Each structure stands twice: as C-alpha cells, then as structure tokens.
Amino acid sequence: MSTFLDMLSGSQCVSLEKCGDVVVSTNDCMIALYCHFCRDLFTQLPEFLRHLQGAHSDVLHFTKEHNVYSVEELMSGEQEDAQSVGHNSSSSDSRGLAKSEDSRATEATEDNSDNSPVKSEEKGSQNEINLLAEVTNILLQTKEKEHINDKLKPENGGFKGPRKKANSESNSLRICNLKSHTIARTSRKRMSIIKNRILRVIDSDLSANHEMKPSEPNSKILITEPIQEANIPGICLETPPKPIPSSSNLSVRKSSLTEANVSLAHTNYAAKKTTPTLPKLLNCAPKPILPSQQAQVHSGSSGIHEVYHISKAASQVPKEMKSFPIEITQIDVFPPRILPETSTTSDKEEDVNAPVENNTRSLYNAQNLPKDKPKKFFKKRGELWMKNEGKITKSKVNPIIVKQVQTSNVKSSPGKTQIRSSDKTKCFASEFNSTKNRKLKMENFIALKKEDPCSIRSIRLNKMATIGNCEILKVVGLPAITDNQIEDTLLQDELETMRKKADQFSKIYRKYDSIWNYRKIVPPGKPEHISQKMFALTREVNQTMGCNLPNSAIKNIINQISVWHYNIYTKNIVLDTISETARYTLNLFSFLPVSFAYFCKCCDDIFTLNEDYIRHLVSQQARYQCTKCIKTFKYQGHYDKHMRTVHP
C-alpha cells in the first residue's frame, strides 16, 4: 500500500492527502470514517466528502465540488440519514463550527457565482439534478411503505389487530375520588330520606287541619246533612236517624192499605224557618207506637213542604228504635255444670311379675314438679301408695283419686276440679269439702318436696344393694353379701356348691383388671373399651357357669361386691357380725382395691363418686324394672315383650 501511495504521490496528476482513517466496530460489524481535523465519525463516504468540502476546504483546497448523489445514497432514503445521524459522535462545538464553515462556503460560492457566469450555469444544472433525485427518493419511499403494509396485513381480513387502549389513566378514579363518591352517595340517600319524612309530616298536618267549608245560609239542607255540617265525630253514643224516603220513592199498594188519607200542605219559602226544629229528630229515645206514620219530605226543586199520613197495614210489625247503652234489668246465675266421668279405675289385680316403678324416679319428679301442674304429682302419688299396698282394690270408704287440685283456685273455681271416681259424686263432694283431708294432702305434699333422695348415705347404699334381692347373687354363689343368715336356710351340699360358684366367678373376674382397677389405671380406659370388656366378662361367666345373665346383671353384681368390700374396709360392717361364708368370699376378692367405680346398668357411663351415680340413677328415664333380671324399660310395651320372650 505504501508503494502504491508513493507512486501516486510522485506523479503530478494525482495529489493525495490523508484526511482520516477507516474504523471497524467488532460488535455490529460497522465501518466508519474518522476525520483527522475535527475527529468525527461518518458511516458513508459521500457524507464524509461533503463534510471535508464544507468544513475543511480551507485546508485541503478542493478544485471540484462533490454534489453528485451516488446510487447507494439514492436507495438509502431517510432511514440511512437518521442512522448516520445516530452514529455520529460530533460534539456541539464541532457542529457549530461546521455550520459556520458551511455559511462561509456558501458566501464564497455566491461571490464566485457573481464573478464567473460559467459557474452559475453549472449550479442551475446541479439544482435540477438534485430536484429529480429528491422526487425519485420520495417515490421509492412511498412504494416501500406500501409494500411493508401489504406484508403486515393478514390473509383473512377479519383480524383487526390489537385493540388500542385509550389513555384512561387521567380519567380513572383514585382512592380519594372513590371515597368522596361514596360519601356523596350516602349523603344523597340520607337527604332523600329526610325529605320524604318532612313531606309526610306536612301531608299529615294538612290532612289534620283540613276542615269542611261551611254551607251558605240560603242553601237547602237535607235531613242527613246537619250531622256532616256540625262535624260530629264518627263515634257517637246515639244512633243516627233513618233517612226518610222522597216522594218519588214512595209506593203504596191499594190492597195492603185500609185507609189512605193524603193531605198536602203548601207553604211559602219563608216557612223554612222552622228547620231549626229538625235536630230534635236526632233524639233516639223510644216513642209510643202511633197508628200512623208521619213522613216529612223537603223537595229541593220547588221548596214545598209535603206531609204524608199513611195508615199502617194489618200485616206490618211496629219497629222500635234501639237505645244505647243496653239496660240490664236482670242477671240469671246458673249453677255449675257437672261434667261426665272421664275415666274409671281398672278392676284387674296386678300380676306377680308386674313392673315396679322406680321409687327414686318418682321422688325426683315430685321434688322438681312445677307449681302450675300438680296433676301429675297427685296421680303418681296415688299410684305409688296403691302399688306399695301390693294390689289395687275398690274402697267403699275412699274410692276417689284426685286428678287435679289447685290450692290457689279452690275457692274461686271448685266446679272445675277434674276427678276420677267409681262411686257417686255425692261421696266426693262430702270428702273434698272436708278441711281435714285437704290439710293432710297438703302436709304430705310439703313433706314430699322437702325429702331429698340423696340426703342420707346409708339409705343410698341400702337402696343400691337391695336392687337385685339376692336372686342374682345366688347364680354366682354370692348371696352372703346381702343376707348374713343364708347359711341357716341352706344345707351343707348347697353351701359347698355356692362356694364353688363364688370361686369360679372370682377367678374369671380377676382377669379383667381394667374393670375392677379402673381408677388406678393411668390413663383410665375409655367407656367404649370398658363396655367391650364388660360384654366379654358376661359372655365368659355365662359359658363357664352355665347361666343366662344379661350385661346389666353383671354390672349390678360388680357394684354390690365393690360396695360391700368398701364397707368392710372402712369398718362400716364389723367382721364379727358377718358369717363364715361372707368371710370366705372376702378372702376370694382380696385382690380388689379400696377405690372403685360405679357402672351404670342402663348405659355405658362410669362414675367415681357415689353422689354422681345416685343422681344419674334418679335421672334415668326407665320406669319399669324386671324383678328377675333387674333390667329396666322406658315403656310398658317393651317390658311386656321382655317378659314374653326372656321369662315365659
């Protein structure tokens, strides 16, 4: 390259001067021309040449002007010009210098054009070439834009492109605007409510203050109008008069009348001064019945006062005016009605296996009985008294059972007392009216309310221990727990068999430590687990001992054994007073702890305190209890079915 430059520099035709360097960008593979004079970068050669001629002509001394566009420059268009401007890194000072130098160059060209006519002709031809080039450039740009738009359009004309969203940021409501909007909305609602209230009050005041207009003095008033004119209130103690029919409405049959004398009295218009006597017709006091009726009619058109005298027919009934208020002349007091008998007592005697009602249940119901329903109390009281006697019989002396007695209303309504009697009502009246019987009944009622089924501990233990009567304990060989004199009634062989049964039961019961050691196991077993163990114990006892005991009977036996062992340990039962069989059973159950739990025979509940267990027994809804297996039932039908199937 250096030799080529030397050759060119040696010749006189060619003079070369180094104006810049070629710079290559490795990032985007772009080539730029670097100017040595002003240190600017240019991406295209024509721009670089124009820059040298315009800005550095004083240094380089050009002989020809470079004003001809190249093909690349014509094809590039406005995009390449914008791109070249982006790649230029000339400072504002250099651009200012370039503008000043361009202005100087233009001035120099103008001076030269004034001096030489040849240059002016060349300049005109160059301007024409520049205009043609600009026109062609504009046409090419428009064609390129249309070609690009055709490419961007899809084949199907249904697609409209992405929707242009309007700039709604300025119109959107902010939080403060939303708050003010809600405040204004609520205030408008409140103001509308207040406005409606004010309007309603005004309307009500107007309707209250509204009065009827008084009639003119010369106006003609009918008989019924004085009531409306005087503003008489709607509620009046006097009955209004009946309207008198007009002359046109009067129709008289000749057949129904015996005599018809009609007299017409013509009076002047001034005779109407007698109208103040009209309000006298409003007095509704009963008047004596006259043989004829007098009707006065005021004609509105002619102003004639007409009076008709009509005689009564034979078939007509005289009508009397009703007076108010009604006068009561006589009050008849009727005797109280005697109601028929509601029900009678049954004549059947109780069977031996009849259900025994739970005493604790009846006592608890009597204690918590409401005051307004003494009906159930007296009924249950009578049933308990009769069942304790063992049978129900008719009594000639006292055959009556009171069904409902209210002490507060005995004097006021004695006739409303409902009774159930098998004898005549005279016997009931003589006994019910006696103060002695009523006093005894009230004393029994007060004593029964004061009685507490859980007050005395020994009574509770005795009740619980005597539920099964010894018959269930005989099945497992443990009757000595409740009866100390059982040895005197049994033979030696029977005693030995009873001890064997007790030994078998104690061995089986020893296996189920989760039942008899419930309070010492930590954590205690769940009721579901204990109930499963209880069913397993019942099944094993029935299989080994050849009996048919229910689950409730096994629970009853366990409770009695635990209470008996606890009483001996706490010295409530002296060892010297018990029999040898009881001592033998005590040795069999020596593994039992002092603390034990109560198992309810009706459900799966377990209690550690005696008071809670007794309270639970009282609250049980089972009223009927079998005397053989101590199983309880809520309804008598279930009890009867049990007796037919289990104890035939």
UniProtKB/Swiss-Prot annotation:
Belongs to the Teflon family. A zinc finger (C2H2-type) spans 33-56, 598-620, 624-647. It is found in: Nucleus; Chromosome. Specifically required in males for proper segregation of autosomal bivalents at meiosis I. Expression is required in the male germ line prior to spermatocyte stage S4. May have a role as a bridging molecule maintaining adhesion to hold autosome bivalents together via heterochromatic connections. Keywords: Cell cycle, Chromosome, Chromosome partition, Meiosis, Metal-binding, Nucleus, Repeat, Zinc, Zinc-finger. Gene3D superfamilies: Classic Zinc Finger. Residues 85-94 have a biased composition (Polar residues). Residues 96-107 have a biased composition (Basic and acidic residues). Residues 76-127, 146-170 are annotated as: Disordered. Its main location: nucleus. This is Protein teflon. The lineage of its organism: Eukaryota, Metazoa, Ecdysozoa, Arthropoda, Hexapoda. InterPro entries: Znf_C2H2_type. GO terms for biological process: male meiosis chromosome separation; male meiosis I. One of its GO terms (cellular component) is autosome. The keyword Ligase does not apply. GO terms for molecular function: zinc ion binding.
